[in-house]
């Protein structure tokens, strides 16, 4: 059997989805708060450099360009250090998410099979009723004729 998920009317069910993009974004910011600080420092340095350039202050402009480089270095350091520090936790989280995905896929498959069984049962009941009605119609026709 292939690993592709089976189609079902349960696809849009909210209990099959675990973490939204916003939840992931906030979780990642909480895990590594230094990266957004580095982004903010770099952006602030660029904004101050722009203001200095407009004012014609070349000394402040050069200071802000250096500050931008320091902000980039800080951000890069935060990314690398966070990657090293949280590497094991990320691997464990990926394993957990994989196991969770397998469980959800199995639940979807089970729900899909249950739905198919219900539909099959309804179809059999309908066929039996239709056959009974057809038999009754034939008997009624025999009695007339």
From Swiss-Prot:
Keywords: Coiled coil, Membrane, Mitochondrion, Transmembrane, Transmembrane helix. It is found in: Mitochondrion membrane. The keyword Metal-binding does not apply. It is a multi-pass membrane protein. The chain crosses the membrane at residues 33-50, 69-86. It holds the Pfam family HIG_1_N. The keyword NADP does not apply. GO terms for cellular component: mitochondrial membrane. Residues 6-97 form the HIG1 domain. GO terms for biological process: mitochondrial respirasome assembly. Residues 86-144 form a coiled coil. Belongs to the RCF1 family. Associates with the respiratory chain complex III/complex IV supercomplex. Cytochrome c oxidase subunit which plays a role in assembly of respiratory supercomplexes. This is Respiratory supercomplex factor 1, mitochondrial. The gene is RCF1.
């Amino acid at each position: 059997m292939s690993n592709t998920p089976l189609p079902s009317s349960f696809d849009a069910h909210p209990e099959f989805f675990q973490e939204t993009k916003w939840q992931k974004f906030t979780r990642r910011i909480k895990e590594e708060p230094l990266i957004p600080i580095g982004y903010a420092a770099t952006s602030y340095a660029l904004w101050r450099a722009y203001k200095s350039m407009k004012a014609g202050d070349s000394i402040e402009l050069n200071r802000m360009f250096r500050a931008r480089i320091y902000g980039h270095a800080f951000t890069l350091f935060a990314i690398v250090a966070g990657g090293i520090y949280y590497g094991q936790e990320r691997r464990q989280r990926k394993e957990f998410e994989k196991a969770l995905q397998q469980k959800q896929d199995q639940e979807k498959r089970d729900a899909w099979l249950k739905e198919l069984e219900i539909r099959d049962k309804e179809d059999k009941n309908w066929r039996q009723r239709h056959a009974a009605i057809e038999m009754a119609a034939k008997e009624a026709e025999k009695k007339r004729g």
